Structure formats: structure tokens, C-alpha cells
Amino acid sequence: MAPRSLFLQRFQPRDLTKAWNQLNLFDEIQFAFLIYSQVYSKTLMDFQKRWAQGVLDLEENAPPVVILKQLAHLLKNKVCYHPPMLVDHPDLARENDRHVFVYLSREKMQKVLEEKSITFGLEAVLATTMQPYRSDLVLQEMVRAHNIAWPHRRVEEPDLEGFIAIFASTLFIHLLELKVTNVYGREVACTFFVRQGTGNRSYDVIACGITQFTKNAGVMPRPAVPSPEPDLTLRLSGPNQKREEGDMKPAIVNLKKETSAT
């Protein structure tokens, strides 16, 4: 079967802009990740294997075809978060799934959904494990964390009103870890990853929505469960998750010390 005759509808991101509280947002995000990993990925792998076999059956050996055949060998065994294309370094699934979130303005979130791409030109993508339903975190604190993690592009509060949830591919590099302070005075680990820009390449987005960070540092959010602080941090990406090969050793940075020094 010729590769060009194959077609697969890419994953449709779950629209969570109407989520009404942090627990609802958590449940919907978790459900979206499960649908992709346990349902859609099976259809995706079947498509990739058929596409790869079609490429490997080609008798032509021109340089572009050789590159496609190298890609075909990879896609027979690994989920790829974008359609098959002539690239040297595809966005492949990691050995252990890594759920990350990219924070962006509402306008840019719409652009991502319309163009089905998380990269624009050579602009790097900054992602974090910190979940958007964390109402115990203040928006201003998250802005400072992003600016410390990636000072090459300064962000302001409107730039973190929206989010997209994705699986981090093998092209996302572990950047560093920060410790942010929540409204209860407790430190929370915040891990950042960065992916260098590769042009407008398609990428499967799992979900999108509006963040629920607290905008007023003087207002204490009401816990969604009967405890001083909702323990939601372990549900999507827990600290017991094994570090993957190729990850740089994290640099622990205390956000308070960083900001006070400036």
C-alpha cells in the first residue's frame, strides 16, 4: 500500500475552557491523557506501522527516500506526536510518558489549536510539570518562575492565562527545577523542559483550557477537599516517576532567593 494513500485523523484536543473548579479540571485533564494513551495511541501505532511498511517497500533510494526509511524504522516502534514527515529528528514518545503543560495567552492558545502546531518559527517551547488546576499557586509566582526558567522570553500575567496539555516528546530537554511558594507558605517543586523551535511542525495537543492560578495573592483559595491543601500534585506526574535517560541532572533553584537577589 502506497504511503500517500493512508490517512489518519489526528487527535482532537479536549476543550476544558468551561471547567468550573480545580477538581473538575483535574479529572478532565487526566481523562484526556488516558484517552490518548490507552485508546488513540493504538490506532496511531497501527497507522504508523502501515505507513512505515509502505515506505520500506519502496525500491527508490534517493536521499529523501533514505531519510523516510530511517524515519519508518522509528515509527514502527514509537508513537510520534506529529504526522510522518521528512524530518531528521521527529517528536517521538519517551520511554516513560511525561505529562507537561505549556502556558500561553488565550490568543496564542487559539492559534495553537487552529494551526495544530506548538512551535512557530524558531521560537522555543517552554513546558512545565506544574498543573493548571493548582489554585494554591499565585499567578504572579508562576510568572516569576517562567521568567527565571527561560529569561530569553519575558512573560506577563496575560501570557499564562491559557494552557495546553501535551506529552513531552524526546525533543523536550530537562531544563531545571524551581521551588515556588504557594499561598499556604509551602514550597512546591516545579520542573521545566524546553524544546527548541523547528518551524511550524504539527503536534498532538491533548487538552486546552484556562488556568486556575490565584490572581490575588491576598485571597486564600478554598480547598476543594477537606485538607489544608488539596494534594493533587501526584495524580498526573509523581516524584516516584523514574528519571529518563538523557535527562540532565536537575538544578534546584529556590525562587525566593532568585527573586530577592534581583
Curated annotation (Swiss-Prot):
It comes from the Bacteria. The keyword Methyltransferase does not apply. It is an enzyme of class 3 (hydrolase). InterPro entries: Glycosidase. It catalyses: O-phospho-L-tyrosyl-[protein] + H2O = L-tyrosyl-[protein] + phosphate. Its EC number is 3.1.3.48. Keywords: Hydrolase, Plasmid, Protein phosphatase. Residues 221-262 are annotated as: Disordered. GO terms for molecular function: protein tyrosine phosphatase activity. Induces differentiation and growth of neoplastic roots (hairy roots). Seems to function as a tyrosine phosphatase. This is Protein-tyrosine phosphatase RolB. It comes from Rhizobium rhizogenes. The gene is rolB.
